Swiss-Prot record:
Record's keyword annotation contains Nucleotide-binding: yes
Requisite cofactors: Mg(2+)
Function: Necessary for normal cell division and for the maintenance of normal septation.
Protein name (record): Probable GTP-binding protein EngB
Keywords: Cell cycle, Cell division, GTP-binding, Magnesium, Metal-binding, Nucleotide-binding, Septation
InterPro entries, per database record: G_ENGB_dom (IPR030393), GTP-bd (IPR006073), GTP-bd_ribosome_bio_YsxC (IPR019987), P-loop_NTPase (IPR027417)
Pfam families to which the protein is assigned, alphabetical: MMR_HSR1 (PF01926)
Lineage of source species: Bacteria, Pseudomonadati, Pseudomonadota, Alphaproteobacteria, Rickettsiales
Gene Ontology annotations of biological process type: division septum assembly
SUPFAM superfamilies: P-loop containing nucleoside triphosphate hydrolases
Encoding gene, per UniProt annotation: engB
Occurrences of domain EngB-type G (ranges): 25-197
UniProt family annotation: Belongs to the TRAFAC class TrmE-Era-EngA-EngB-Septin-like GTPase superfamily. EngB GTPase family.
Residues annotated as binding GTP: 33-40, 60-64, 79-82, 146-149, 177-179
Protein residues bound to Mg(2+): 40, 62
Amino acid sequence: MVRRITLNSNFMFGASDIKSLPNESAPEIAFAGRSNVGKSSLINLLINSKKAARVSSKPGCTRQINFYSMYNDKFRLVDLPGYGCSHASKDETIQYLGLVEYYLIHRRNLRRVFVLIDSKVRLKEIDKDFIYWLTYNNINFDVVLTKIDKVDRENLDAIIESTRKWINNESVSIRQISVRVKYEMTKVRDEFFKFTR
């Protein structure tokens, strides 16, 4: 049974450039991943809201960094633009990737990055490039496998093992979630809250 949690949360605003980033007064947890991997859906599930984060059936809906304030800004959830968006122009891609890189490198109150991977397609080269980049820049991250309801248990175990072997870092946790069946949500929430203390 999934534990129900009522969260005091609200959308702060979306930052489309460095100057519009909010102050660093509260700890932040960021969610990253390829376009349409399920970041917005996961955020909605974490805070028990169907509408807090905009969910799109088309890749690349999020073109800015969206901030969600929790418990009167005790901490924040951060929805990063999806990388690998085929619908974005070259100029748009350069602009929002530059913003994301700046945020991840310079944000002093960033506690953890959760990298979402679609378990149906496993690690893509663009995911590996992003994880390499995080590692090179000494940015702490964990991996969250999404859409696990679309993969049978045997294949899921193989995906977890291959992902763990490729990352080869014991400090990186690999979580499994399905927004549809809310699998492992209690554990994901516990991991989420741990970094906001």
